[in-house]
Each structure stands twice: as C-alpha cells, then as structure tokens.
C-alpha cells in the first residue's frame, strides 16, 4: 500500500461516522404529564388593507380595432389602380402577409380578449354573460365622466385614489366589503398597467411620404406589424396576470415589490392604532409578502369589461403569542398499563405576558401564513384569561397546578395499554418524543457506514431523540420500529426546549394505578389526543367501578368487553351509549310483538272475536225485549255468519224468542230454527 493511500485511510478512520455525533438523546421526567413542543411565535390578523388596481383592457381593444381598420385600408390601397400601376415589387408580399398572418392574428387576439373576460366572475349589475367584444368601426366604449383626484367614500380613512367615477368607487367599496368581513381600509392604486406606445409621430411621417407609393406601403406594413406585436404581448401578460390572480399569486404586471413598498409607505399613516403591517416596512421584506402568498389576490370584472385586481395585505395585532404542540406523556406501570392525560386541544397559544391563551385547531400551523419570523393566524372566537384557566393542559404549562386532588376533577385522565416502544414525531423532521417501557437498543443504519459501532442504548423512560448535523440519509431501527433521518439543507425550525414543570407529578395522583382493572384492548402507539379519547378508559369510571367492588373476571369481563365494543362503535357516530341501547331495546320489543302477532294470525285466527261475540250475546239475552219492535242483526255461530230474525215485514210477531236462520247453502233456506 502506498503512503498516500495509507494516509487517506487513516484520515477516513479518524473522521468515521459515529452515531453519537449525529443523535442526541435528552431524557425527560416521565411523570410530567405533557411535553410542550414550541412551534413558533404567532400574531393574529385583526384587519385587512385592500389595494385595488383597475385595468381598463378596453383600451387595448380600441387599439386592436383601430389596427384592424388600418390593415383593411392598406389592403384596399394595394389593390387600387394607382398602386397597381406603380408596379411595386412588394405588392404581392404585402397582400399575402395581410391575408395569411395579420388579419388572422387580429381575429385571434379578439378571441383572446373574450377568453380573458370569460375566466373572471362578472359583476351582477355588469354586462350580460353572453355579450362579446367584436370588431367594428364604432368606439366600443361609451364616454364616461371621470371623477376628481379625491372622491371620499365613507370616512376619510377609506377614500380611494384613481381615475374611476363615483359609481365604480362605490361598487368596489361594496365588493371589497363582501370579499372580507374585516375590511375597513381601501386604497386604489393608479392604473399604469396598460401603456400602449403611441405611434402618432410615425404615422404623421408616413402620411408625408404618401406620394412614394411603394415606400409608403412597405413602411405602413412594418408599423402594423410592430403594433400587432405590442398588442399580442399585452394580451399575453394580462392573461398570465389573470391566471395568477385566480391562483392567489401576484403577477409582476399587477404589483412589483418596489411598487408594493411605495404604496404601503404612502398609507402607513392611516393604519389604525395598535395595528401594524405583517413584516417590517422594508424593501427586502416585500418579497416575503409576495412570494409566500401572505398578500391575497382577487380579480373581478365590472361593467364595460373593466378588470379590478384586489390585493389584501393583513394588518396584525401587536400582541405576540407562543404556540406549543401539546403531547401527552403516558405514565406506565406493569403489563403495559399506562395512565395518560388527554389534552383538550392539540395546540395552545400563550401570550408573551402570560395573561391570555387561546386554543387552536389541529390544522392551525398549515392554515396560518408563515412570514420570515412569525405565524399569521386569524383570531379564534374565544381568547381565554390565564388566571381563570381550569383545564389541566394549560394549568401545567402556566405552572398553575396547586394540589393533586384536583387532577381527577380538572384533567381528563385515561388508562389504557400502550406499546412498549413509542416514537412520536415532533418538529417535522429528525425529532421524536420516545416513551419506552424497557431498555432499548437503537441502531443507526447508513448506506456507507458500518452499523456495528452505531448502536445507542436508551434507558426505559421518556425523552427526546434529536438528529443534528445529518449529512446523509440514515435509518434508526429497533426490533419493531424504524425512524428515517433526513438530510436537510437548512433548519426549517429553530428548536428550543421548554422547562417542564417539576412540581407536577402525575404518579402522586395515580397511586392506585396497579390496582385498576381495565378491559383487554389493543395496544396504543399513537399519542394524538383524538385517538386517545377512543382507545382508553376514563380513570374516574375505573375508580367508581373499583369502589363499588365491581371487579369482573372471566365471563363477566367478556360480557363487559362486548358492551364496551358497542359503546365504542356508536361513539364514532357521536351518539350516547345509553341512547343507542334504548333504541336497540325498543326495536327488539317491536320485533317480538310483531312475531307474536304473526303466530296468532297463523295458528288461531278469530279466537278473540268469537270470545267477544259470546260475551256480548250473553249480555243481550239478559235484557228484556220489546214485544212490538223487532230488529234484524247478524251473529257468528260455529265460525259462520247467521241472520237473527225476530219477525218480518213490520208485522207483530207472536214469537217471544228470536229465530235463527243459518246462512248455509246446504240447508233449506225455508227451515227456521228456534233459539230455545
């Protein structure tokens, strides 16, 4: 082996990849109840400032219509006898280019103009949906009265700048109000978007050279081509700007960072007290507002096909909040049985002065906008006072826990079975909260490194595993778990540790954990608060059962487990277990009654009717009859209908007892039997 190769080999061994250089293990007290992972600093959006940019793209169409007329005029000019007699060599070329390119391109731009309009939601009081722009010889825009430099709408801090008339200003003000309920400030940015170069001097120069027929036609053709190229570019840029606005992106045609900085600087004096811009007012910060989509963009279409782009710049409160992810830490005993406090929300925001706190939705970090430093979120409906906090997760964070007797009252303590190895991802990348019920070996496996020397032994308990200075993609493996380490170009999060409360000790409030009997259920490996609610049992219910000596064994435990399964199933439908059991009982009783009724109808139909008829006949026989008045009736004898006749034809009957005639075809209908 050469000396150079030996030196390289020694250097490689000296810089060998070691797991201890990459993996950091930070033990945490396993009795603390919660781990509070810092997410970021947060501020609430209190209001919105609207910048309104009006684009009158009808001006472009006017230029296109005028160019169309000039092209037709030049085509007629080349076909005139005077021009033909001049015998210009470019005559055929000009006529061919007009027919094959110029006119077709103009018609295509007309179609593109209407396509841009069709993309945008029209105003209810604007043009009809089926109205289209067409080339004609008249001015497509009716003359409109322009308003002055200032035209106040509402209060002085809501005036609009620009060249629109009063009707448009009022309509835009109402439109901005409906697009965001927090709207209080509106400013229109002067329209400088559609700048069409004027060729008046060039046209006048051409008219002076009109006597030179061949030179005039060539120069006129070059001017038309240049104008068409410019209009084509304007339509392309405007189409991209509309598409970007519909996708909530700001196109440079609408607003550049420099222009946004100037407009925000001009209206800063009108920003309400205690509100400020989401970023410090510097030119370098304007890119963050535009590129990170902090500024929202809308586009609308007004009457006469005018387009307005509305930019919403949030105004934030000066109060800052620290956002934490609340992760429950199970306190485990024997046989995988653990107690855990289920938090009321996944995220908590605490003001920097600790006086207020808020509860955030589970998707708050994704729903909020991220600036270079802070999260921007819309304020929730309720902002709580810290001194009046009653729930366990916020009291532990604020060090408000006073006694262990209140744990059962203020905390949603649950008991369940957990996996012996739990690794819960935090901070997105290369950070895990671990809960281990036994000593565990963690092996680092990298593609170009030996795993024999990359073994980390972690004692049973709770802590944080953090990957630092990860220069390659590796895997951390135990006997049952695998964690992926990612190589990051930069740190997406500034990780900071929060000192946990040392005064709170969950084990002091759960001295009877080993005595609690729980139902046999699947082990938990997820520490999400919503998952824990359905996969564990309440401590208060277990203690009531234990105090009532309701400890079940064997078959009783299986029956209880079946009830628990039913309650767990209906719990997914947000139905109380008692209500569901009552409904099931009513359905069962109804089915039993229906079954008995069907058996009666099949086996002994008419039994009840016969019994009722007998009772009624006996009652009637005991009542004295009127001799001078008889009445016919029908009775059932031996399951057949019989006619009861006490006389006939209204004549007086000499029989004191009724006569019975059987309605039977086999008998002689003239035979009458007495009822003795």
From Swiss-Prot:
It comes from the Viruses. Keywords: Coiled coil, Fusion of virus membrane with host endosomal membrane, Fusion of virus membrane with host membrane, Glycoprotein, Host cell membrane, Host membrane, Membrane, Signal, Transmembrane, Transmembrane helix, Viral envelope protein, Viral penetration into host cytoplasm, Virion, Virus entry into host cell. Glycans are attached at residues 76, 87, 266, 469, 505, 548, 628. The keyword Signal applies. It is found in: Virion membrane; Host cell membrane. Residues 169-215 form a coiled coil. The chain crosses the membrane at residues 577-597. Residues 1-16 form the signal peptide. Its main location: virion. It holds the Pfam family Baculo_F. One of its GO terms (cellular component) is viral envelope. It is a single-pass membrane protein. The keyword Glycoprotein applies. N-glycosylated. GO terms for biological process: fusion of virus membrane with host endosome membrane; symbiont entry into host cell. Envelope glycoprotein which mediates the fusion of viral and host endosomal membranes leading to virus entry into the host cell. This is Envelope fusion protein. It comes from Lymantria dispar multicapsid nuclear polyhedrosis virus. The lineage of its organism: Viruses, Viruses incertae sedis, Naldaviricetes, Lefavirales, Baculoviridae.
């Amino acid at each position: 082996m050469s000396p150079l190769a030996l030196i390289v080999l020694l250097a490689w061994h000296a810089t060998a990849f070691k797991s201890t250089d990459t993996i950091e293990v930070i033990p945490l007290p396993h009795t603390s109840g919660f781990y509070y992972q810092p997410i970021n600093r947060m501020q609430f959006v209190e209001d919105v400032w609207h910048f309104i940019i009006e684009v009158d793209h009808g001006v472009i169409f006017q230029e296109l219509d005028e160019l169309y007329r000039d092209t037709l005029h030049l085509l007629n000019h080349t076909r005139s006898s005077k021009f033909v007699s001049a015998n210009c060599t470019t005559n055929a070329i000009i006529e061919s280019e007009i027919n094959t390119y110029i006119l077709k391109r103009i018609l295509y731009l007309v179609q593109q103009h209407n396509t841009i309009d069709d993309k945008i939601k029209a105003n209810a009081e604007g043009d009809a949906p089926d109205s289209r722009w067409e080339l004609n010889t008249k001015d497509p825009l009716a003359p409109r009265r322009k308003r002055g430099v200032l035209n106040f709408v509402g209060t002085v801090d809501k005036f609009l700048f620009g060249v629109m008339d009063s009707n448009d200003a009022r309509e835009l003000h109402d439109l901005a109000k409906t697009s965001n309920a927090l709207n209080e400030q509106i400013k229109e940015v002067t329209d400088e978007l559609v700048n069409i170069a004027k060729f008046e001097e060039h046209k006048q120069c051409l008219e002076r050279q009109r006597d030179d027929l061949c030179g005039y036609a060539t120069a006129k053709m070059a001017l038309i081509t240049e104008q068409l190229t410019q209009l084509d570019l304007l339509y392309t840029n405007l189409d991209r700007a509309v598409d970007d606005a519909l996708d909530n992106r700001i196109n440079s045609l609408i607003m550049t960072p420099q222009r946004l900085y100037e407009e925000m600087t001009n209206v800063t004096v009108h920003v309400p007290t205690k509100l400020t811009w989401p970023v410090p007012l510097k030119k370098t910060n304007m890119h963050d507002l535009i590129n990170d989509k902090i500024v929202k963009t809308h586009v609308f279409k007004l009457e006469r096909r005018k387009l307005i782009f509305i930019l919403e710049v949030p105004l934030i409160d000066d109060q800052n909040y620290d956002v934490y992810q609340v992760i429950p830490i199970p306190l485990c005993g024997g046989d995988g049985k653990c107690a855990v406090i289920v938090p009321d929300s996944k995220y908590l925001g605490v003001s920097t002065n600790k006086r207020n706190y808020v509860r955030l939705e589970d998707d708050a970090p994704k729903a909020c906008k991220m600036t270079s430093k802070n999260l921007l979120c819309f304020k929730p409906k309720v902002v709580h006072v810290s001194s009046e906090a009653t729930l366990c997760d916020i009291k532990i964070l604020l060090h408000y826990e006073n006694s262990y007797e209140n744990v059962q009252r203020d905390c949603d303590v649950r008991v369940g079975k957990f996996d012996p190895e739990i690794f819960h991802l935090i901070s997105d990348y290369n950070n895990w909260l671990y809960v281990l019920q036994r000593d565990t070996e963690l092996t680092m496996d990298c593609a170009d490194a030996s795993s024999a020397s990359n073994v980390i032994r972690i004692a049973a308990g709770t802590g944080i595993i953090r990957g630092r200075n990860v220069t390659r993609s590796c895997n951390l493996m135990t006997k049952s778990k695998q964690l992926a380490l990612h190589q990051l170009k930069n740190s997406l999060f500034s990780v900071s540790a929060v000192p946990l409360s040392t005064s709170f000790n969950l084990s002091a409030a759960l001295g009877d954990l080993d005595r609690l009997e729980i139902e046999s259920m699947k082990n938990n490996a997820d520490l999400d608060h919503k998952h824990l609610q359905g996969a564990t049992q309440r401590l208060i219910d277990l203690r009531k059962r234990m105090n009532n000596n309701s400890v079940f064994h064997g078959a009783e435990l299986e029956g209880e487990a079946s009830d628990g399964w039913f309650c767990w199933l209906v719990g997914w439908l947000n139905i109380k277990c008692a209500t569901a059991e009552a409904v099931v009982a009513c359905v069962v009783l109804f089915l039993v009654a229906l079954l008995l009724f069907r058996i009666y109808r099949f086996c002994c139909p008419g039994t009840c009717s016969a019994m009722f008829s007998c009772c009624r006949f006996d009652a009637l026989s005991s009542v004295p009859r009127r001799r001078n008045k008889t009445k016919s009736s029908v009775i059932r004898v031996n399951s057949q209908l019989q006619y009861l006749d006490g006389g006939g034809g209204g004549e007086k009957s000499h029989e004191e007892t009724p006569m019975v005639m059987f309605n039977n075809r086999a008998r002689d209908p003239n035979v009458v039997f007495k009822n003795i």
